[in-house]
């Protein structure tokens, strides 16, 4: 065999190894997908807005609709979550474009301007854009009327703060499109304010008009009851997350699958119920009375709510107490319930309350009773929804609440979903249905309204305290409401006089405003506990 014969296989071997090496280099040089980058980093970076709906730091840590969704998405990826809140909308999309965040989850709509440069995920709820004004002021019924009014007012007062929107918002994009038809219309783009800042200015008469999403308006009315929607400027628009546009489909595909699974499992519906399910008809008169009570009554009872709230958020306990008694320790009803937490005599005895008119005993007893209801709520119900079932039990009784769950199941709906069960609660007072139940007739519509009112009061308390925090610059929300209790306040006669004066003032204010209010007044239920 010639030497050349040996060289052929050796040369072939070297050529094969070289080819493998080149292929390996080519594989290594291929760019990583977005998913691979995130998993390799071990962190999902989420841009969001700091507000009660999307993301904020509560007493128990981070919370918010977009936060909870992002937390579940990070679990799906098997990485940690890093929320990167922005205080100005205009800084969010540049951060996404520059690669500082992986996604934006901030309750933003799919405007045409955004979809030019970014990709939107699946819609998870819908909103309309509304023109907002101060109740009692002139109300435009259309954009044409608004433009005509502006021309009249600015002719006499060119410096008038007429219409402002947030910089780089979908409201700005909508108004720019409107200017194509109404070129004389003028509006101010505010780069130093967020939507809540502008809504506050409208409520205080510092600005005539602004724009906000329908959900934002409903939530803000619980803090600023003077706000009202003049008219809708758009149809319902989808709210979604956003990612960068690229040829890489990996992150987008997983996002589609993620939201699809959430919808199918019912988890998305339960989160929406938690954060926006309580939004209902706005009651101007009741809300004004509540806002006033936040300043005149809540501070006196805050230390006791904080002391006895135990595993509950003290602000939720405060909302429950307002629904029961309007924070009046001497409240009583014809059915025999009385005190700050409106306990029946049997319930009071069962939780060790000897004097239902003693505020401290009443709060302690009410929280203990709520805790017992929580313990009885079935474990099949998700943790974040258990409280609504417990509150319904607090009002209507555990047996009736379970009857409503059984009715829900018999009708093919989910007995562990508060959204499904609350729709069946009114059936407890319809003969067609309550004759099928174990405990019979109950005022189920009141129980449903009872829980929804507490949820609204709870969100209002949170928003009110946050506004006071911003106004004072104090980083401790709790310290804002903890006011030293005057010893005289625990003198029963002196306390009664104070409360009687407040009650008269609230009643007078309600009567004055009820004539101009077209919305029905939702009164708190005094349904006895059982």
Swiss-Prot record:
Its main location: membrane. It is a peripheral membrane protein. Residues 28-279 are annotated as: Non-LT domain. Residues 280-530 are annotated as: LT domain. Residues 1-27 form the signal peptide. It is found in: Cell outer membrane. It is an enzyme of class 4 (lyase). InterPro entries: Lysozyme-like_dom_sf, MltF, Solute-binding_3/MltF_N, Transglyc_AS, Transglycosylase_SLT_dom_1. In the N-terminal section; belongs to the bacterial solute-binding protein 3 family. In the C-terminal section; belongs to the transglycosylase Slt family. This is Membrane-bound lytic murein transglycosylase F. It comes from Vibrio cholerae serotype O1 (strain ATCC 39315 / El Tor Inaba N16961). The gene is mltF.
């Amino acid at each position: 065999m010639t030497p050349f014969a040996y060289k052929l296989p050796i040369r072939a071997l070297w050529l094969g190894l070289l080819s493998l090496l080149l292929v390996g280099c080519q594989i290594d040089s291929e760019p990583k997908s977005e998913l691979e980058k995130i998993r390799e980093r071990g962190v999902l970076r989420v841009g969001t807005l700091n507000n009660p709906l999307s993301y904020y730091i509560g007493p128990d840590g981070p919370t918010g609709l977009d936060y909870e969704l992002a937390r579940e998405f990070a679990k799906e990826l098997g990485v940690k979550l890093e929320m990167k809140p922005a205080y100005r909308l205009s800084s969010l999309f540049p951060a996404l474009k520059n690669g500082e965040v992986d996604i934006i989850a901030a309750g933003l709509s799919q405007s045409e301007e955004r979809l030019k440069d970014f990709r939107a995920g699946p819609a998870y709820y819908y909103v309309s854009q509304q023109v907002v004004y101060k109740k009692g002021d002139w109300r435009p019924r259309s954009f044409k009327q608004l433009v005509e009014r502006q021309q009249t007012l600015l002719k006499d007062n060119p410096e008038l703060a007429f219409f402002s929107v947030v910089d780089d918002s979908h409201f700005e994009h909508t108004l720019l499109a409107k200017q194509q038809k109404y070129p004389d219309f003028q509006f101010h783009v505010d780069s130093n304010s967020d939507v809540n800042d502008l809504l506050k200015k409208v409520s205080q008469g510092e600005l005539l008009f602004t724009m906000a999403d329908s959900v934002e308006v409903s939530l803000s009315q619980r803090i600023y009851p003077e706000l009202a929607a003049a008219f809708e400027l758009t149809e319902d628009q989808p709210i979604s997350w956003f990612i960068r546009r690229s040829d890489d489909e990996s992150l987008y595909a997983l996002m589609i699958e993620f939201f699809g699974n959430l919808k199918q499992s019912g988890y998305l519906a339960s989160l929406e119920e938690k954060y926006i399910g309580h939004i209902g008809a706005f009651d101007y008169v009741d809300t004004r009375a509540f806002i006033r009570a936040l300043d005149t009554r809540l501070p006196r009872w805050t230390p006791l709510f904080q002391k006895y709230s135990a595993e509950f958020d003290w602000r939720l306990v405060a909302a429950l107490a307002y629904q029961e008694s309007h924070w009046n320790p001497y409240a009583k009803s014809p059915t025999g319930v009385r005190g700050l937490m409106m306990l029946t005599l049997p319930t009071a005895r069962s939780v060790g309350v000897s004097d239902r008119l003693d505020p401290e005993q009443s709060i302690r007893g009410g929280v203990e009773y709520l805790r017992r209801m929580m313990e009885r709520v079935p474990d099949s119900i998700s943790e974040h929804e258990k409280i609504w079932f417990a509150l319904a039990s607090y009002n209507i009784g555990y047996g009736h609440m379970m009857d409503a769950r059984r009715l829900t199941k018999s009708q093919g709906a989910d007995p562990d979903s508060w959204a499904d069960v609350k729709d069946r609660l009114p059936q407890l007072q319809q003969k067609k249905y309550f004759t099928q139940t174990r405990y019979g007739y109950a005022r189920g519509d009141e129980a449903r309204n009872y829980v929804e009112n507490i949820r609204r009061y709870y969100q209002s308390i949170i928003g009110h305290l946050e506004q006071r925090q911003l106004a004072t610059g104090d980083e401790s929300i709790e310290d804002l409401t903890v006011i030293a209790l005057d010893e005289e306040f625990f003198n029963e006669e002196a306390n009664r006089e104070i409360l009687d004066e407040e009650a008269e003032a609230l009643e007078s204010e309600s009567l004055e405003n009820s004539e101009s209010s077209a919305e029905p007044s939702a009164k708190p239920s005094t349904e006895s506990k059982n």
